[in-house]
Amino acid sequence: MFENLNLDKTFQFLLIILAFLMPLTVFGGNLIIVIICVLWLFSGNYKSKFDQIINNKLMLASIVFFCIHLVGLLWTEDLAWGLHIVHKMWYFIGLFPILYTIVRKDYISHYISAFLLAISITEVCSYLVWFEIIEPFKHATVSNPTPFMSHISYNPILAFAIYLVLHEIFFNKKITNFVFSLYSFFSISMIFNMFITGGRAGQVAFFAMLVVLIIQILDKQRIKSLITIFIVIPGIFFTAYQASDLFQKRVNLAFNQALEYQPGS
């Protein structure tokens, strides 16, 4: 069906576009995902794809995870809600296995560059709204400047972007002075942006990411890793708590909710 189409290059082009659109538009990202899935389903070579998927433990775990949700429908008290959850989990059996068969190591730097470019656009817009240089638009408000998506989605994506940039700073031995300076500024601005927006899940992911990064940097030095974690994490947390009214309110709210929580309520 696609004899005259270079499918591999087409998939790489679509993946780069997907990486760029993910932080900017849910609709655009979903549209690219649909195109990728349709192309994959009609591109043939099914036995090779199937063998590639079932011979990977992570992909098998992804499929089993989805199937567990599916089997759980047999004893759910709310079938409509159960179907809703299963619908949200489709990518464990559909998207992830498909991506596994088409992602190419040689193009990973292109995926990351496209993703970080999009993050830089969202960040610039976020600061423009926060400094009241432009009027808030779409999801953004001055007090919670996340224009292209809600803070619930934005902050976890921002945490992932921070990890990618910091990983490049600490582990890329060939990084130039200019790129090092650019990435250092970018990481600081993203970390600050993390705490002027209100996504608690993303902020938790940020601190978890820092723990992982510190352990990676201080590989096999457990004592140094623990000491660094116990200094850096509380240091950033309390600095953000004092500097950001929004972060302070979110922390206080989470603390109060934890105190008021009663099992079974």
Across the structure, where does each feature detected by a protein language model lie?
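Flexible juxtamembrane loops connecting transmembrane helices in multi-pass membrane enzymes
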Residues: A240-S265
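Membrane-embedded alpha-helical segments of multi-pass membrane proteins
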Residues: F27-Y46, V86-I98, S153-I162, V204-V211
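Membrane-interface helix caps and helix-loop-helix hairpins in membrane proteins
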Residues: W75-L83, N193-T197
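Alpha-helical transmembrane segments of multi-pass inner-membrane proteins
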Residues: L70, Y107-K138, M149-D219, T228-L246
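Juxtamembrane membrane-water interface segments that cap and precede transmembrane helices
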Residues: F11-I16, E135-P147
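Aromatic-anchored transmembrane helix interface
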Residues: L58-F65, L79-V103, H110, A114, ...
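Transmembrane signal-anchor hairpin modules in multi-pass inner-membrane enzymes, especially those
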Residues: M1-A80, T101-S113, E168-S181, I223-F230
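Generic structural signal for conserved hydrophobic packing positions in ordered secondary structure
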Residues: F20, I98-L99, S150, V251
